[in-house]
Amino acid sequence: MPKMKTHRGAAKRFKKTGTGKLKRAHAFTSHILTKKSAKRKRNLRKTGYVSTAQEKAMKKLLPYL
């Protein structure tokens, strides 16, 4: 059986934490920021985590992470 391949796009977007969760950045932070409140932009800077519902799908994309 051939080696499993890592999905390179996903590998660049996610990092694994010490406890095994997947860390991610929030979307909607690159442009059209004038209409977004300071509070919303500040919260978007914080770390997001992959939901437990998506963990199985992410494991397929990132078998060696």
Curated annotation (Swiss-Prot):
InterPro entries reported for this sequence: Ribosomal_bL35, Ribosomal_bL35-like, Ribosomal_bL35_CS, Ribosomal_bL35_sf
The name this protein goes by in its record: Large ribosomal subunit protein bL35
Pfam families named in the record: Ribosomal_L35p (PF01632)
Gene3D superfamilies named among the record's database cross-references: 4.10.410.60
Gene: rpmI
Ranges for region Disordered: 1-23
SUPFAM superfamilies hit by this protein: L35p-like
The family this protein is said to belong to: Belongs to the bacterial ribosomal protein bL35 family.
GO cellular component entries: cytosolic large ribosomal subunit
GO biological process: translation
Source species of the chain: Clostridium perfringens (strain 13 / Type A)
Molecular function GO labels: structural constituent of ribosome
UniProtKB keywords: Ribonucleoprotein, Ribosomal protein
Record-linked PANTHER family: 54S RIBOSOMAL PROTEIN BL35M (PTHR33343), LARGE RIBOSOMAL SUBUNIT PROTEIN BL35M (PTHR33343:SF1)
